């Protein structure tokens, strides 16, 4: 989606290559482009894991090459109140939240968008791999997958609404990552070969267990298998997620030929977290029934069109980078919905997002609250 005619567009410059090429493309189209660098975390500015200072230097260097102004804006208080506090609450409740989803909804497309409008922007743009399309038949703005299937980020953007989408551009969503890198090198961007960021949104890459340990209380408890046998002790339920295989401290795989099925040599996976009893349940084998679900329930739904989809056939992702899975919307009322899947889904995790699609169009989604066993399929 291109912006026309000439407009004042504020670009969120992160210091990465995607937002840098975003700013360049819009400048090439003749728009008045202003860059804003968002600082959203300052608890440990001097830590070896905090990259915001380096990222700002990179963003400023990019702005200089492109020939645009850049502003440094601090949203640390908003991030802590709206994103990080909820992130901690979810972990303390035994769920596994997705901070990138909340960060997009509350910071990049709320706090940042509001600030951009206050400084005279007509639209904002970010380096997300997604697309926005206006549908003249319905009068609605649609959120579409990015053209590069390996980089599509629509899953993280499913909480955006019509007002936000109408004022947002995703220029690199029309490109593949290889093209973005090529453009960056051709115009001499200093961060053309900078690696993609990972880790917690705006907090960066760091040892997760050590980081989480600073903010939440935790209590060790038993690790039990599906037959109730005690296999060891966990360090706190918050530090584990469903489907986890590494770091359980109960032994490894003795026979690499028995990875998917059960048996005494199969690997162990986290299957359940019994918060009330402080028990971590593990099972052997990737395809153990406790790891498979045919149904799920979700809440706190956001529908991009402003209304829930009709009951019937659909497709969904229950985690990022997952292939779309055929499903049926069995109920969608208010903020709640339920899905059933003809093919069992693996390690459906409370706290993660279930995001619905109609082809390339992202319909919205919600937070998974529960998943049903394989024998509960409709």
Curated annotation (Swiss-Prot):
GO terms for biological process: tRNA wobble position uridine thiolation. It holds the Pfam family tRNA_Me_trans_M. ATP binds at residues 12-19, 38, 127. The active site is at 103 (nucleophile), 201 (cysteine persulfide intermediate). CDD domains: MnmA_TRMU-like. GO terms for molecular function: ATP binding; tRNA binding; tRNA-uridine 2-sulfurtransferase activity. Residues 98-100 are annotated as: Interaction with target base in tRNA. GO terms for cellular component: cytoplasm. Disulfide bonds join 103-201. It is an enzyme of class 2 (transferase). Gene3D superfamilies: Adenine nucleotide alpha hydrolases-like domains (2.30.30.280), HUPs (3.40.50.620), Translation factors (2.40.30.10). It is found in: Cytoplasm. Keywords: ATP-binding, Cytoplasm, Disulfide bond, Nucleotide-binding, RNA-binding, Transferase, tRNA processing, tRNA-binding. It catalyses: S-sulfanyl-L-cysteinyl-[protein] + uridine(34) in tRNA + AH2 + ATP = 2-thiouridine(34) in tRNA + L-cysteinyl-[protein] + A + AMP + diphosphate + H(+). Its EC number is 2.8.1.13. It comes from the Bacteria. The record marks 128, 352 as: Interaction with tRNA. Residues 151-153, 319-320 are annotated as: Interaction with tRNA. HAMAP family: tRNA_thiouridyl_MnmA. Catalyzes the 2-thiolation of uridine at the wobble position (U34) of tRNA, leading to the formation of s(2)U34. Belongs to the MnmA/TRMU family. This is tRNA-specific 2-thiouridylase MnmA.
């Amino acid at each position: 989606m291109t912006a026309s005619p000439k407009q004042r567009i504020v670009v969120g410059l992160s210091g990465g290559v995607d937002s840098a090429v975003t700013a360049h493309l819009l400048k090439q189209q003749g728009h008045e482009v202003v860059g804003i660098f968002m600082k959203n975390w300052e608890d440990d500015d001097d830590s070896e894991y905090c990259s915001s200072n380096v990222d700002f230097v990179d963003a400023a260097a990019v702005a200089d090459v492109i020939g645009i102004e850049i502003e440094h804006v601090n949203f640390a208080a908003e991030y802590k109140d709206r994103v990080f506090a909820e992130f901690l609450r979810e972990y303390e409740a035994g769920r596994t939240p997705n901070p990138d989803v909340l960060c997009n909804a509350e910071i990049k497309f709320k706090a940042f968008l509001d600030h951009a409008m206050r400084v005279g922007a007509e639209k904002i743009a970010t380096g997300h791999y997604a697309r926005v399309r206006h549908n003249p038949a319905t009068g609605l703005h649609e959120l579409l997958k990015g053209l590069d299937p390996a980089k599509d980020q629509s899953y993280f953007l499913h909480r955006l609404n019509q007002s936000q989408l109408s004022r947002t551009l995703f220029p690199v969503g029309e490109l593949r990552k290889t093209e973005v890198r090529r453009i960056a090198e051709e115009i001499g961007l200093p961060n053309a070969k900078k690696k993609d960021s990972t880790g917690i949104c705006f907090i960066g890459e760091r040892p997760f267990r050590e980081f989480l340990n600073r903010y939440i209380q935790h209590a060790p408890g038993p690790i039990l298998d599906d037959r109730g046998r005690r296999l060891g002790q966990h360090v706190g339920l918050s530090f584990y997620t469903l489907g986890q295989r590494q770091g359980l401290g109960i032994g490894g795989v003795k026979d690499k030929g028995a990875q998917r099925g059960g048996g005494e040599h199969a690997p162990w996976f986290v299957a359940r977290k019994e918060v009330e009893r402080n028990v971590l349940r593990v099972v052997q084998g990737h395809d153990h029934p406790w790891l498979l679900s045919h149904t799920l329930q979700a809440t706190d739904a956001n529908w991009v069109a402003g209304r829930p989809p009709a009951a019937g056939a659909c497709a969904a992702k229950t985690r990022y980078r997952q292939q779309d899975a055929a499903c049926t919307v069995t109920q969608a009322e208010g903020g709640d919905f339920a899905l059933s899947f003809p093919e069992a889904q693996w390690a459906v995790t409370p706290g993660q997002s279930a995001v619905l699609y109609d082809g390339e169009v992202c319909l919205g989604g919600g937070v998974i609250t529960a998943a049903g066993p394989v024998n509960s399929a409709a």
